[in-house]
Amino acid sequence: MDRSMEPLTPSRLNTLGERPTNEVYEYGKGKNVQHLFPITPMQRPLGKENAAPGTISPIAVRSRNVRAVEIADENACEEPVLKIKSVSSTESEEEKESSTEIGEKQEKETHLEPKTPVQTNTNNNHLDDIQCCAKNLRLRLELAMYKVQVNQTFSPLQDLPIVAKTKLHNCPNSEPVTSIWNQRSLSSGKPPSLHLSGNRRLSMGSPTKSIYDQNGLTTPRPIGSDDLTHMYDPYTSPLRTPSRTLSRSSSHYLWVRHGKLTRSVSLLQHKTPRRIRPKSLSKSNSTPLKHLSAQKPNSNYYTGPPTPVSISNTPENIHPSSSEVRRIASHSKQFSDYGLIR
């Protein structure tokens, strides 16, 4: 496809709006390729590894190509000397002396610094960057692991991952963590007493895995309960314990609401369904209240319908302070008349 026929998308355009040349998009061949690559943490100066992108100027970033840095340094050192020599013919004698001194100083500096240590210094800096970044990452990882270790036993159980939950449930020589939900009060001096609701007897296998009695809530433990499918231990976790004890009959799953016609497992051979009601509804232990006839009150208390009173004539509203006192007295117990009489 011809290049002129390609659509001009913004990603293919320069900052000036022109189409860039091919050499910019070839890796490492263009002249201004360096600014296209993202600044990696290895290129950042020491102490700025975690700085936000864009906050560090590209001048502070070391170039990747060590040889290019050497060539640039040589050019920078040679250019002022050449300029001074070309201009020195038109200058006065004093300026000549000063310029030659400057040139000699720069030449001495360039002769004193050999070319090979530049490469070793940049390599050492690069290694220092790598070591510093690795140390920083190691410290962060250690801090994260420490936080996990510290918070694991004290954090609420639903915030922990699944594997941690199973490990905490089956942890030897410690009471199950889930029972902290059943505790009544926190004592200030000693750690909270953990206890389980229901009748509990310890199994012979491990000291902490508890099994409820047959008259309790749950059935015997299935084999292979360490799988993630049995994540919540039904013997220690209150998440699996039902709110009420299940009935002994085999038909407790088939029961519907009160008074509905249900067919029990034990009654399946009967063709006609029976109405099943709990005992609490079949027997009424409470006696109904006696019907009180609407009697008129005694003449002592009943003086007729209430007489309307205008608000402006009432003595409470004459002084605003007295009305405020009455309002307070009517709303609070400590200022009420009943308290004064008592």
Swiss-Prot record:
GO terms for biological process: negative regulation of transcription by RNA polymerase II; regulation of transcription by RNA polymerase II. Residues 1-22, 83-126, 183-228, 266-330 are annotated as: Disordered. Residues 205-218, 309-323 have a biased composition (Polar residues). Its main location: cytoplasm. InterPro entries: TF_Nrm1/Whi5. One of its GO terms (molecular function) is RNA polymerase II cis-regulatory region sequence-specific DNA binding. The keyword Amino-acid biosynthesis does not apply. Residues 271-280 have a biased composition (Basic residues). Belongs to the WHI5/NRM1 family. Component of the MBF transcription factor complex. Negative regulatory component of the MBF complex involved in cell-cycle-dependent transcription. This is Transcription factor nrm1. It comes from Schizosaccharomyces pombe (strain 972 / ATCC 24843) (Fission yeast).
